[in-house]
Amino acid sequence: MDHRLLEIIACPVCNGKLSYDKENFELICKLDRLAFPVRDGIPVLLEHEARELPLDEEK
């Protein structure tokens, strides 16, 4: 994931900062506890595509 892209894009739900999880190929919003998939290098920033992070999952 290009670090310049991470500086530009934001969570579509709260407009918060996203961080990249290299292991799971996901963009993480810590504020909303959502993980957005990255498919073929393309972030899928659709709320209905995101998975909720369990309370015990730390990223």
UniProtKB/Swiss-Prot annotation:
Top-level taxon of the source organism? Bacteria
Name the InterPro entries on file. Answer: Trm112-like (IPR005651)
Q: What SUPFAM superfamilies does its record include? A: Trm112p-like (SSF158997)
An example GO CC term for this entry is: cytosol
**Record's family?**
Belongs to the UPF0434 family.
Query: What name is this protein filed under?
Result: UPF0434 protein plu1633
Species of origin: Photorhabdus laumondii subsp. laumondii (strain DSM 15139 / CIP 105565 / TT01)
